Amino acid sequence: MNFSRSADLFKQAQNSIPGGVNSPVRAFKSVGRDPLFIKKASGCKIEDVDGNQFIDFVGSWGPMILGHCHPQVASAVKAAVDSGCSFGAPTELEITLAEMVINAVPSIEMVRMVSSGTEATMSAIRLARGYTGRDKILKFSGCYHGHSDSLLVKAGSGAATFGVPDSPGVPQDFARHTLTADYNSLESVRTLIAENKGQVACIIVEPVAGNMGTVPPREGFLEGLRTLCTQEGIVLIFDEVMSGFRVAYGGAQEVYGVTPDMTTLGKIIGGGLPVGAFGGKKEIMTLLSPSGGVYQAGTLSGNPLAMTAGIETLKLLQAEGFYRNLEEKSSYVAAGIARAAEKAGFPIYSARVGSMFCAFFSKDPVYDWTTAAKCDTEAFAKYFRLMLGEGIYLAPSQYETAFVSIAHATEDLDRTIAAAEKSFRAL
C-alpha cells in the first residue's frame, strides 16, 4: 500500500497543529508509524487520502454502531442543516431525544445534553459534589473519563497509551481530591472509603472498562459498588460514554442489572456528531441551573444537528433483533481472531462484552490496569501494522477497544479473521 499523501499531510500538520493531530492517540506513536489521514467512510469501510480502503473496527472510537454515513441519519442531518446549524435556544428536537434517552436508560429520570463525553463526566461530578456537599471523588486505575483535571489521575486510554498516568498542568490540589482504586476490587474501594469517611461525593466507574482494552466487571463488582454507595450516601456514576446504547439499548446497566444514581453518555446518542449527556435521579438533576444552584452551560448543547442525528440513530437501534444481530457478528469475529492466534501458537487473552472486544497480547487473564499493563505492546504494534497492511483498521493502541457495527457483513468478518491468521503467523 502507498501512504505517501498521508505522510506528506502529517508533516504539514505538525507545523500548525501540536503533534500534527487534534487528539494524541491519532498520532500512531505507540504503533511505530505515521497516522492515516482519512478522506471518507461508508458502512464499515474507511478510505484514506491515498485511496487505500480498510475494514474499520474503530468506528470513530465507538459511536458508529450503524456504520459510517447511514443513509437515514445522513439524510435527516442534511435536511436539518437547511433549517439552521445552531440557535443557542431551545428546540423541540432536544425534548424528543431527551425522552428517548430517559425511556432507554434505567437510571435516567432527567437528562442534560452537552457537547462531549468529557463535558458530561465533568458536569456529573460537579453535580454530585453539589448534591452531597463533599469534595472527594473515587475513580479506578486505567479508567478514562475525559481530560478534565480531576479525572486525569491514573487514567487509561490515551494516557495509558503514552505511559503518562498523570498529566503536567494538573494541580496537586485537584489530584488530592481524587482517590484511585483498583478496577474489579471491592476491597480497595472499601479501604479508601473507610480512610475518607464522609468525604467521598461520588464513585465514577466504567461498568465495562473500555479504555484499557475491554475489561468486563467481575461478578458482584458493580453490585458491591451499588451497596457501598447506598450505605455511605455516595453518588454512583456509571460512565457509559462507551457502553451506553452499545452493549444493549439500555447500556451496561441493563446488561448487568445494576442501576447507578447518574449516567454519562457520549457521541453514540448523536450518531457520532459532537454530543454528550448526563442524567440520573430527578432529585439530583433538579439541582442543576437554572432550576438549582449547580452551574452548567454550553452554547452548542442540544444543537439541532446532533439532536437530529441522535433521534434517527436511536430509532434505528430499536429495530427488532438489532442487538441480537450485532451480538452474533461480534461473537463471530472475536472468536475467529482468538482461534487464529491459537492456531499460530501466539498467546492472547480475548475479552468481549457485546460489540466491544479486545485481543490482549498476554497469556494471562486481564481484569484490571495492573494485569492490562503487562501486555506485550511491541508485539501488538507489529500486529497492528501487519493488519493495516491487510486492509484492517484497528485502534492504534493495545489499550483501546475494538467496535463492531451492524454494517460489518460476514464477508468483512471472514476477511478480518483471515488477515489475523496471516498476521499472527508473521509475528
Swiss-Prot record:
Record bears the keyword Cytoplasm: yes
Annotated Pfam families: Aminotran_3 (PF00202)
Compartments (UniProt record): Cytoplasm
Keywords on record: Cytoplasm, Isomerase, Porphyrin biosynthesis, Pyridoxal phosphate
Enzyme Commission designation: 5.4.3.8
Single Gene Ontology MF annotation: glutamate-1-semialdehyde 2,1-aminomutase activity
Coiled coil (residue ranges): none
Cofactor names: pyridoxal 5'-phosphate
Top-level taxon of origin: Bacteria
Modified residue annotations for N6-(pyridoxal phosphate)lysine: K267
GO biological process: protoporphyrinogen IX biosynthetic process
Pathway of action: Porphyrin-containing compound metabolism; protoporphyrin-IX biosynthesis; 5-aminolevulinate from L-glutamyl-tRNA(Glu): step 2/2
Isomerase recorded as keyword: yes
Similarity field: Belongs to the class-III pyridoxal-phosphate-dependent aminotransferase family. HemL subfamily.
UniProt xrefs under PANTHER family: GLUTAMATE-1-SEMIALDEHYDE 2,1-AMINOMUTASE, GLUTAMATE-1-SEMIALDEHYDE 2,1-AMINOMUTASE 1, CHLOROPLASTIC-RELATED
Subunit (UniProt): Homodimer.
Protein name: Glutamate-1-semialdehyde 2,1-aminomutase
Organism: Geotalea daltonii (strain DSM 22248 / JCM 15807 / FRC-32) (Geobacter daltonii)
Taxonomic classification: Bacteria, Pseudomonadati, Thermodesulfobacteriota, Desulfuromonadia, Geobacterales
